Curated annotation (Swiss-Prot):
InterPro entries: CbpM (IPR022835)
Intrachain disulfide bonds: none
Highest taxon of source: Bacteria
Natural source organism: Pseudomonas entomophila (strain L48)
Upper classification of the organism: Bacteria, Pseudomonadati, Pseudomonadota, Gammaproteobacteria, Pseudomonadales
Gene field: cbpM
Protein family: Belongs to the CbpM family.
Protein name: Chaperone modulatory protein CbpM
Length: 101
């Protein structure tokens, strides 16, 4: 029997992990870059992927001087590229089985 560990972070912990201010987290949430559970910032709970996403978002915002809307789009496109690469790799493996026969 296997169990799944679910990690959730509150606002303070997320800010510490991602080295981001609460004001930026609120702004990033407003643009849909990360989506917490809870109604207010005091109640927000984030999943374990949120610190990485926040760090990437802040880096794009600062280094490329993108507005948050542009950051959201860039992150969405980067995720889509990663998914396509994974799918392509899987399809290559499946195709390789047929060509080795």
């Amino acid at each position: 029997m296997s169990s799944t560990l679910i990690v959730q972070l509150d606002m303070r912990t997320l800010c510490q992990e991602a080295d981001v201010s609460a004001d930026w987290v609120i702004e990033i949430v407003e643009h849909g870059i990360v989506e917490p559970s809870g109604r207010t910032p005091e109640e927000w709970v984030f999943d374990d992927r949120a610190p990485v996403t926040l760090k990437r978002a802040v880096k794009l915002h600062q280094e490329l001087e993108l507005e948050w809307e542009g950051v959201a789009l860039a992150l969405e496109l980067l995720e889509e590229v990663q998914q396509l690469r994974s799918e392509n790799s899987m399809l290559k493996q499946r195709l390789g089985r047929f060509t080795q026969m």
